[in-house]
């Protein structure tokens, strides 16, 4: 289906109010958003030191705040991420800790607190199997934590290499390859060649190899895992590709190569980019706007190119910090978080 030929619009479904400070990040529960008859669940985290859990009613289709996770973090909660099972929620905070919350149905309990970073924790990410998670911090380090029995978490590795604040960590969707991006303008790829847990930096994507020229804020992968989008303070989005079959065979590391750069679509820092399961890239930026892009399907001599699908100006009243597509197939729901204190739910729909 050629999305460019369809007359699409991004429709605001609901504005979720409750946070009393800027909202930094949103995360969809991976299980609830898939299952038939199960209400979608969204987590949001904020400068008000809390995480809110939102649920959509199966009857009214409206969203309500089901619970507020508070009194664990003493400073801003910068990032939140669900485990693949949807049972655990990890929360990264400026207080230097990462909280692990267990979903007991109607309530959540903080079952573990990961300590070790010297400064603010900026991001947290689970690997595809849920056997470990990664965190990163203003202390320039990336930590890998192994999930043990009895709600115990063990620091398996401390990865150093970035020269500045690390903004985000993201595991590859199908393999235990970890990606980090930083205020040092680079993306680093970490891989354990022998699967022995000894992670090494196997590639650095920087300005010298068609990378970004300023802070890299966000990383996201397409469903197949053979392409990656990154976004930056340099006002661009970049698309990268790899030989995924070679990587999955385990024979050797297949380097990521720059495929194309999308520029001129935002005029302030691009803070977030997220790739949907049906291949639509969303971006959110400091210009209060959201943009959607799709593969043009017309590969030129220079490689693939991406077209602007639509633009939503004034999506929020302030910076858009996070955009996240629902993992559910075909529903085309997008959540956004902003400095204006709001979370918004959008639907990509055909114009009437």
From Swiss-Prot:
Essential component of the cytosolic iron-sulfur (Fe-S) protein assembly (CIA) machinery. Required for the maturation of extramitochondrial Fe/S proteins. It is found in: Nucleus; Cytoplasm. One of its GO terms (biological process) is iron-sulfur cluster assembly. WD repeats lie at residues 18-64, 72-111, 116-155, 161-200, 211-250, 265-303, 315-352. Part of a complex composed of AE7, CIA1, MMS19 and NAR1. Interacts with AE7 and NAR1. The keyword Cytoplasm applies. HAMAP family: ciao1. It holds the Pfam family WD40. InterPro entries: CIAO1/Cia1 (IPR028608), G-protein_beta_WD-40_rep (IPR020472), WD40/YVTN_repeat-like_dom_sf (IPR015943), WD40_repeat_CS (IPR019775), WD40_repeat_dom_sf (IPR036322), WD40_rpt (IPR001680). Transmembrane segments: none annotated. GO terms for cellular component: cytosolic [4Fe-4S] assembly targeting complex; nucleus. Disruption phenotype: Embryonic lethality when homozygous. Keywords: Cytoplasm, Nucleus, Repeat, WD repeat. Its main location: nucleus. It comes from Arabidopsis thaliana (Mouse-ear cress). Belongs to the WD repeat CIA1 family. This is Protein CIA1.
